[in-house]
Amino acid sequence: MNIYIKTMREDDDKEVVAQACTSLADIVRDCGFAIIEPYITRLADATLILLRQESCCQQVESDGEDDGDIDHDEVLMDAVSDLLPAFAKVMGSYFDPIFTKLFDSLMKFAKSPHPPQDKTMVVATLAEVAQGMGAPISAYVDKIMPLVLKELASSEATNRRNAAFCVGEMCKNGGAAALKYYGDILHGLHRLFADSEPDDAVRDNAAGAIARMIMVQPQSIPLNQVLPVFIKALPLKEDHEESMVVYSCVCNLLLSSHPQILPLVPDVINAFAQVVVSPNESDEVKTVVAKAVSHLISVYGQQMQPILSALPPAHANALASFANRR
């Protein structure tokens, strides 16, 4: 660990420092907080120096930045920013005092003249820190949300995708601090469900954001307007890391017989049938979906038969097979 810290601070090769940061993030995720606890203050200081662009590798003089220098900077800062979510994942809420020290230096990368890829690096980092740190992110919501809302309308698909993921995590973990932004968030996300959105992963992450919002603040969502758009976006096409949260949200609404979801049951069943035949979805996700279908059959009986009969035979058989495992 001492060698990693020394490399971060003193090595003059950006590629070497980037690799040290990447390796360190992997070690933290794999081994947990215990292994870094004795070093956490020094690790945080080394990370801060890199975010401030004051380490040895960032001070090397050159005759001007060429494309290679810019590429090296991007690789380096991606690796540095990846340390923050790694720390947050293993430290949880205890990461907050360290994040406070790093926050302003991280946010500078989202300001001009930094390029779009720096902005989305910041947004992705914030999303994963919120995911790992939990409730303490609420103290940062007012500083983060203006950036993320703007990024929802970025011309870059990666930026829109990360922004959608970030607003979902901010709403999930930001508590009351995030509530006042719900209207603006829903407006920004709505564009990502439109036919004009060309990127499936963006739409999948928008669905993930809506799911998180519904699960934490259902009373703050106009479900009669949101659910038809949300359900129409299913099944997820590309980012299956969002599958569990999205389908769990839908299933919770079904299991509670929420009045706004019931008219959409035919569309939900059609999406669920595609989920259970998809090679890209886990058995865990398929089991969650099947449980909800079994519930609907047990509660609504004959009313479900026309819906199930309208499915392609292969889909209907797969859905029945999973439902019967329960």
Go through each PLM region and give its residues.
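Karyopherin-beta/Importin-beta family HEAT-repeat alpha-solenoid scaffold
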Residues: 1-326
